[in-house]
């Protein structure tokens, strides 16, 4: 039986400030690096990562002697107009309220919908 582990990248500055960080290619922050150094996982047979720097850095810290394969389709969702902003910065944006009211079912303005992101991610697993 094949086991697939989905591991979220370590903390970034954007995460620290509760920003929507999707296509923004930012590195791990020092705290994120330190936290990852205290985590261990069993050695996997293969490692597939997003092309984003934070994901590659996470894999390198967790599995330092293993080769990683970059899969473009595994990249995070494109948050469009909400990218690199947090809820406080978006609170007066009517598009943000409409997205909230839709329970996140609407596409991000100028970005992807959950369905588009999921379909792209699924392609990466095939």
Model-flagged regions — what are they?
Residues 37-40, 122-126:
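Generic structural signal for well-ordered alpha-helical scaffold segments
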Residues 2, 7-66, 112:
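Active-site-proximal alpha-helix that buttresses catalytic centers in soluble enzyme cores
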Residues 62-120:
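Phosphate-handling substructures
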